[in-house]
């Protein structure tokens, strides 16, 4: 939060003239760096602001530690076969979804089907999906009810949705209901950090992500240790 422009509010905490601190330690799972020559920006590899690096722990070391610090993980991809695509279009099932979600793309629909296949095959219990917008995240939630109706062979999936502008009490209810059972939680960015639900065993990126920091932070939701969890799936 402190990295970036020296004039941003969070950077205020690093300036000795603002807050007098004798000793300070910084801990992060996602080091943020600024590349450039400007003195107007702060970067975590600058010892003038953040001090010298005293310890670093890799993902591999955290997984292989005895006992482990985080869960091992697998990166998986699921696709839709040609026969499945033909069956979906020939039976007009895609059109049924389009009647409800007029702006849904074939790719979004295929992603929802692929997630159901992954849940069924890998016995995933609690998944969270990340989307590039709140609207797409909420649409993905609505899709799940339609898929349950159109493809009963995939079983039922409880779906929840949270967003940053939700009242805190409403968001807490959604998170509690999700944590107490099995299902899917959709969001845009509000679950990227600050969430500690060990039961989460799958993270889904429904839209391309280019930020390494965002990817690591989001993937970390599925790497908390939990009884019975062998892998976190990404």
Predicted regions and their residues:
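Switch/connector loops and helix/strand junctions flanking conserved nucleotide-binding motifs
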Residues: 3-4, 33-38, 84-87, 195-196, ...
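Post-DEXD/H (motif II) to motif III coupling segment of the RecA-like Helicase ATP-binding lobe
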Residues: 3-70
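Conserved C-terminal RecA-like helicase domain
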Residues: 8, 98-188, 209
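Alpha-helical scaffold elements adjacent to nucleotide-binding pockets in ATP/GTP-utilizing enzyme cores
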Residues: 9-13, 40, 139-146, 174, ...
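Short glycine-/polar-rich loops that comprise or flank the Walker A/P-loop
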Residues: 19-23, 50-52, 69-73, 155-158, ...
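A short beta-strand-to-loop transition that corresponds to the Sensor-1 phosphate-sensing loop
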Residues: 27-31, 133, 189-190
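Conserved interdomain linker/interface between the two RecA-like ATPase lobes of SF2 helicase motors
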Residues: 51-135
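Conserved RecA-like P-loop NTPase helicase motor core
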Residues: 159-234
């Amino acid at each position: 939060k402190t990295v970036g422009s020296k004039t941003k509010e969070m950077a205020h905490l690093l300036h000795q003239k603002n807050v007098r601190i004798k000793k300070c330690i910084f801990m992060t799972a996602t080091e943020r760096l600024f590349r450039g020559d400007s003195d107007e920006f702060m970067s975590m590899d600058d010892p003038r602001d953040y001090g010298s690096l005293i310890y670093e722990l890799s993902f591999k070391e955290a997984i292989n530690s005895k006992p482990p610090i985080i869960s091992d993980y697998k990166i998986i991809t699921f696709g839709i076969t040609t026969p499945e695509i033909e069956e979906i279009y020939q039976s007009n099932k895609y059109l049924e979804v389009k009647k409800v979600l007029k702006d849904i793309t074939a790719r979004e629909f295929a992603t929802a089907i692929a997630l159901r296949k992954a849940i069924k095959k890998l016995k995933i219990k609690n998944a969270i999906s990340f989307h590039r917008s709140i609207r797409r995240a909420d649409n993905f939630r609505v899709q799940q009810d339609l898929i349950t109706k159109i493809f009963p062979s995939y079983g039922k999936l409880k779906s929840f949705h949270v967003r940053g502008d939700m009242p805190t009490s409403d968001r807490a209810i959604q998170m509690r209901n999700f944590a107490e059972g099995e299902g899917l939680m959709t969001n845009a960015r509000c679950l990227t950090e600050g969430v500690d639900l060990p039961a989460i065993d799958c993270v889904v990126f429904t839209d391309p992500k280019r930020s390494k920091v965002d990817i690591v932070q989001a993937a970390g939701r599925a790497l908390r240790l939990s009884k019975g969890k062998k892998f976190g799936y990404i």
